[in-house]
């Protein structure tokens, strides 16, 4: 493995067998080296293989200016997230989370901590991601000796949601607001007190996450068969009426008209949450 470029003493780039650029990280990898020299395999700690040349360039920039210990800490957090969340996280997370952690630590050392305006929503809508965010604060404290405020757990959680949805951070924040607006409509329309540990609640939140993404992306879901919609409308009257209230709100604030398919699935999820809470109350 030959060095193509030396970014700093700890980070170099190489070309793989398909002539794709890879970023290789390890303490002392680039020290007293020149392009064309062989990489010392014993020093390699991490190899980043990003298929996009743009991502590779952005990652190279991040790794060139951020201390190795911060990079390896962010990598540990991402490994934990992959283990806990399952599924794929976008490669761009290596860039965004490393960059975020670096600046959060720098700001904290300067006494400038930022309040997370979506902290309340993140705690309730992204419980798994927020729990990982709290673990991440412990990892940062243990490895770097810096105790970041709890608001940073919320920011880290949003980065994880971003990596799952393959969206940009501003869009993730808009998605979160849409989700909270809908949950509030259901809560007050049906006079519910959510059980945030219930399976039906988690399924509803997951549905809302992807629904909000489609809404903001203007990608509606249609169905040629409307017979099930009519059954749901007739059978789940309260839930369907609540879904219509949501439709009115979305039309007013987002200029988006729900399809019958979207109305139907909202009603189904609302009914699941409502009926489960009703059963628990009866017990």
From Swiss-Prot:
Key words, A-Z: Activator, Phosphoprotein, Repeat, RNA-binding, Transcription, Transcription regulation
SUPFAM superfamilies per UniProt: PTS-regulatory domain, PRD (SSF63520), SacY-like RNA-binding domain (SSF50151)
Residue ranges annotated for the PRD domain, each copy included: 65-170, 171-280
InterPro entries registered for this protein in UniProt: BglG_antiterminators, CAT_RNA-bd_dom, CAT_RNA-bd_dom_sf, PRD, PRD_sf, Transcrpt_antitermin_CS
Job of this protein: Mediates the positive regulation of the beta-glucoside (arb) operon by functioning as a transcriptional antiterminator. This is an RNA-binding protein that recognizes a specific sequence located just upstream of two termination sites within the operon.
Molecular function terms from GO: RNA binding
PROSITE patterns linked: PRD_1, PRD_2
Changes after translation: Phosphorylated and inactivated by ArbF (EII-Bgl). The degree of phosphorylation is dependent on the presence or absence of beta-glucosides which act as inducers of the operon expression. Addition of inducer result in the rapid dephosphorylation of ArbG.
Gene3D superfamilies listed in its UniProt record: CAT RNA-binding domain, PRD domain
NCBIfam families documented for this protein: LicT, PRK09772.1
PANTHER family, alphabetized: CRYPTIC BETA-GLUCOSIDE BGL OPERON ANTITERMINATOR (PTHR30185:SF15)
Origin: domain of life: Bacteria
Protein's recorded name: Beta-glucoside operon antiterminator
A biological process term (GO) from this entry: positive regulation of DNA-templated transcription
Source species of the chain: Dickeya chrysanthemi
Family: Belongs to the transcriptional antiterminator BglG family.
